Amino acid sequence: MSLAPHGGTLINRVNEQYDLTSVQKEIELDLISFADLELIGIGGYSPIEGFFTEKDYVSVVENMRLASGVVWSLPITLPVDSEKAAELAVGDTVKLTYGGETYGVVDIEDIYTPDKQKEAVHVYKTDDAAHPGVKKLFSRGDTYVGGPITLVKKASKQFPEFTFEPADTRRSFEQKGWKTIVGFQTRNPVHRAHEYIQKTALETVDGLFLNPLVGETKSDDIPADVRMESYQVLLDHYYPKDRVFLGVFLAAMRYAGPREAIFHALVRKNYGCTHFIVGRDHAGVGDYYGTYEAQELFDQFTADELGITPMKFEHSFFCQKCGNMGTAKTCPHDKEDHVILSGTKVREMLRSGVMPPAEFSRPEVVEVLIKGLKTKEEAGVS
């Protein structure tokens, strides 16, 4: 049996028979809140039952804990503009819509004005408007609405055969007889360095939960459908089928570095993972965070508080002298012998149709990525 969800109980706020007839007011969600609504409803964000009230918001921003004391590192908020805020009152039940359809309701317990400057500095460690998370934070509404939600309709899925709720993955892991499961978060294609880390972790646990994020990302990130095809090709050719489970993570990317690493681990705990891989600059962007800052943040919490074991890995690479993958812990050779490419450089190569070296990425994966990006470009999709 997999370990307990965060907070002890897997939250279920789904009621598809909810009677909406008397609910008149509505809030139109953006992509971030739309994904958060469903993840709260299905228990992905357990123990959270709704969008944050000011008490939880302030506590998480300042202390990385809910008001109850439970560890939680990112504020899950419902921003609205001042015009919409003026229509709302504490005690209202309000529809949550996206694209004109109702997906949930919120029972408003709090309406408050956040200190976004403080939120940026605490959560993102910067208020630089060039940071994609900070830019998004300041572009959203300046009033936050808090209260428990009910998910009345689930969104149609881009990848239905790879979409699972926490209850589904927990059941699957149990049926497979897996007692220890390591989660791996990614918004990028899986290159040889990631493969090496995953397989090293897989040597010590029963199963790998490859859980790529398919929510909103930066415009220059590889599109989710292209990435999904590349993951399938990689798993088919290079991984033991009975040791890996592929499922998508619906959330938007925050690019909050260390804090987002904690968040990613806690969510995977809810999906049934016992371990979580934390690599270099996890959930980072640009040079805003230290290479191993995310790994260090895990040390601020006790094992009991987190309830999931971080597996910390150094930057890995192919060493031409060793003739295999390694890290600074296992390879004695100089950087000149290491095949290292930045994510930006690889994206440039792929978009130009240039094959990165086989030591960096599996050729089957590269073919899928080049073809997929070319098709997107021809269709006018970035």
UniProtKB/Swiss-Prot annotation:
GO biological processes: hydrogen sulfide biosynthetic process; sulfate assimilation
Extent of the signal sequence: none
Catalytic function, reaction form: sulfate + ATP + H(+) = adenosine 5'-phosphosulfate + diphosphate
InterPro entries referenced in this protein's UniProt entry, alphabetically: ATP-Sase_PUA-like_dom, PUA-like_sf, Rossmann-like_a/b/a_fold, SO4_adenylyltransferase_pro, Sulfurylase_cat_dom, Sulphate_adenylyltransferase
Family, similarity comment: Belongs to the sulfate adenylyltransferase family.
Organism: Bacillus velezensis (strain DSM 23117 / BGSC 10A6 / LMG 26770 / FZB42)
Pfam family, one: ATP-sulfurylase
EC number: 2.7.7.4
Enzyme class: transferase
Gene Ontology molecular-function annotations: ATP binding; sulfate adenylyltransferase (ATP) activity
Domain of life: Bacteria
Associated pathway: Sulfur metabolism; hydrogen sulfide biosynthesis; sulfite from sulfate: step 1/3
Keyword ATP-binding: yes
UniProt-recorded name of the protein: Sulfate adenylyltransferase
Keywords on record: ATP-binding, Nucleotide-binding, Nucleotidyltransferase, Transferase
